[in-house]
Amino acid sequence: MMRYPLKSSFAEQIRSFVDYKNSLGFPYDESCRILWKFDNFCAERFPEKDSLDRELALAWLEKRDTENTAGHRNRIMVIREFAKYLRAVGTEAYMIPISMTSKGPRYVPHIFNEAEIKAFFHGADSFRPHEKAPARHLVIPVFYRLLYCCGLRPAEARLLKKENVDLVRGAVYVVESKGHKDRVVAVADDLLQIMRSYSTLISEIYPDSDYFFPRYDGDGPYTKRWTEEMFWRCFSM
């Protein structure tokens, strides 16, 4: 459901687009905020336009002085998804070419060998309960196994909510992932058993948390910095 007030000629189409995403079982919170800004942009800059044409799309493409590369790319990708939806329902729309979106510096990944992976998970399993982080020893082994076994990105797992983890069917619903796309990830039986046991234990500690991996106080997810620090600590255990 679109929670922001809309005023442009695209208002009904935006609402329908969000309803479509919601009908698939995925919230669209961050994208809704971007769509709301797009609606304001259209109402102020192109009040007479009722179609997502090239002129409007390229105007939206322009990078702002205070905008970083990731933020610029995110708002472009949301409107690409919107244009794709419009085309699917029979409405003409200009899709910004993917080649025109911002790209960050190229990153060369390190491929871990078997010994490094074994050492990493030995470290992950070696954490002990801590008075200021009573569930850290439960979270870390499952969090990084989910990344390793299912290919989730750190932010996707970190922000994962309980409602998006199906421990019956063995599925994780990833919402608002890279490119503002949603997907369903299957969980293997051995990892599923681990996640079920973890869920039972973590719910006893943080029964009211919405997050599958709640932070030390149970009031939200862990930070990006925390996941990076714990990653390197796993190698030093």
Role assignments for model-derived ranges:
Residues 1-237:
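Conserved catalytic core of the tyrosine transesterase superfamily
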